[in-house]
Design a protein with these regions (language model features):
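N-terminal leader/targeting segments
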Residues: 1-62, 124, 144-152, 162, ...
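Structural detector for short beta-strands of small beta-barrel domains
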Residues: 65-85
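Divalent metal-coordination and catalytic microenvironments
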Residues: 72, 126, 192, 220, ...
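OB-fold (S1/OB) nucleic-acid-binding surfaces
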Residues: 83-104
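Aromatic-rich juxtamembrane segments at the membrane interface
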Residues: 143-267, 275, 426-429
């Protein structure tokens, strides 16, 4: 045999081997094209998002300054500042010709503005100026481009559109019903039900933050779920298309009622997409819905990326989607009773999801939250579920009857507050 030759047998490839190799090749190509498409889409999205961010940050440079006289609309509900002192003031955000300006009002103007809510308009005069350098970045994330000073407010107001009037009528009725509770309990109740934390004292805010319960006073998916559950007896009687329209209306109404906070925007957007997919018969994974909502919302409003509530809500939702079931199986494998395993898995998953944004925003993560949530969330959930209709009924009753109707809510709210205070003390001992 000549040198350099290789002895052996020729093996003919079978059709099955060739088909398997062809399938593997096509599968590899398919995955390559899929990854390439994903990278391309993400790159285009990031470029577009950067351009949107630059446009939003530069928008304040073109805001008109100087004297103003005309119609201004409240963007948010006015906030009472230094309520305990004689020099109390009212802080309000007005929209003037499409631009947002913040004003701090005193005297008669403060008293007139304090009685009104977001969406209502009034004729005023004032001086438009730039925001201080220390507050410029923070105000820009709220789309506030300047400060309004020397404000004089007229006494005649416009109540806004029919939708605004209806929403504000509900909020005033809720405030009347909540007034049947002591002041601090009323402030916490409104925070649990509609996310209105304007009147919560600083010690209450710190207690909920230190105990890992601050998410309870930020309206999110849990509140959306409870509102839809309360409306379910009516929605389930409708035909599919009518049910879809009614559900979207309920979501829009609750979003406006809660003043479109970042957390409720995320929750309402996810609920709307889920309802649309369900009606169309599509099966979409929850994580994909979350990613679509986050991407869509930050493109529409890039300033959401600087809102802590938005990232805490998104992080908690991601934690629940990805980690809740594995953690539940883990706790069950450790012989934890099912009655405890599920809420413990839910709490742990949400805490893990919010750990990073909480640390970046507040510089700390409260480990006591794993325990406090087990005691506070079930009672807070009951308050969220029945609190809205009960408070509306109490608001339409006399003071004595309203007090009786709101008595269960008083016990529920006080329980949640006690858990927060005890959790705060335990957190300080652990520090």
């Amino acid at each position: 045999m000549p040198s350099g030759t290789i002895r052996g047998r020729f093996v003919r490839s079978s059709p099955g081997v060739l088909m398997g190799q062809s399938y593997e090749t096509r599968s590899a190509q398919w995955w390559f094209h899929r990854v390439l498409l994903a990278v391309l889409v993400c790159s285009v999205f990031m470029v577009f998002l950067v351009l949107r961010c630059q446009a939003e940050w530069k928008k304040a440079e073109y805001a008109p300054m100087g004297s103003f006289s005309g119609v201004a609309t409240l963007v948010a509900d006015p906030v009472l500042v230094n309520a305990a002192s004689r020099s109390s003031a009212v802080r309000a955000v007005f929209q003037l010709e499409g631009w947002r300006f913040q004003a701090t009002l005193y005297g008669g103007s403060a008293r007139r503005v304090a009685q009104h809510l977001a969406g209502e308009s009034v004729y005023l005069t004032g001086e438009r100026g730039e925001v201080s350098a220390t507050q410029k970045h923070r105000r820009a994330t709220q789309h506030i481009v300047g400060q309004l000073t020397n404000v004089q407010v007229a006494s005649t107001w416009s109540d806004g559109s029919a939708f605004t009037r209806a929403t504000n009528r509900i909020r005033r009725l809720l405030a009347t019903g909540a007034s049947r509770l002591p002041a601090n309990e009323a402030a916490l109740f409104l925070g649990l039900v509609i996310g209105d934390d304007r009147n919560q004292p600083r010690e209450m805010i710190n207690a909920f933050r230190d105990s890992g319960l601050s998410h309870l006073t930020a309206v999110s998916g849990q509140n959306i779920a409870f509102v839809l559950a309360a409306a379910a007896p009516l929605l389930t009687r409708m035909r599919p298309r009518a049910r879809l329209v009614a559900t979207l209306f309920v979501l829009a109404w609750f979003t406006v009622l809660t003043r479109a906070e970042p957390s409720v925007l995320r929750a309402a957007a996810m609920a709307a997409i889920s309802v649309l997919c369900f009606t169309a018969g599509w099966q979409v994974k929850s994580l994909a819905v979350l990613a679509l909502c986050v991407a869509g919302l930050v493109v529409i409003d890039p300033m959401l990326m600087w809102q802590v509530g938005f990232w805490m809500s998104s992080g908690a939702t991601a934690g629940l989607i990805v980690l809740m079931k594995p953690l539940q199986r883990f706790f069950q494998s450790c012989h934890v009773p099912g009655l405890i395993a599920q809420p413990l898995a839910t709490t742990t998953a949400a805490q893990i999801g919010t750990a990073l944004p909480m640390y970046m925003a507040f510089g700390r993560v409260s480990p006591i939250g794993l325990i406090t949530n087990l005691f506070a969330v079930p009672i807070a959930g009951v308050v969220m579920l029945v609190g809205l209709p009960v408070c509306l009924v109490a608001g339409m009753m006399s003071a004595g009857l309203g007090d009786m109707v709101m008595l269960p809510m008083r016990f529920g709210v006080r329980w949640v507050w006690w858990v927060a205070v005890i959790g705060q003390r335990c957190a300080k001992l652990m520090a």
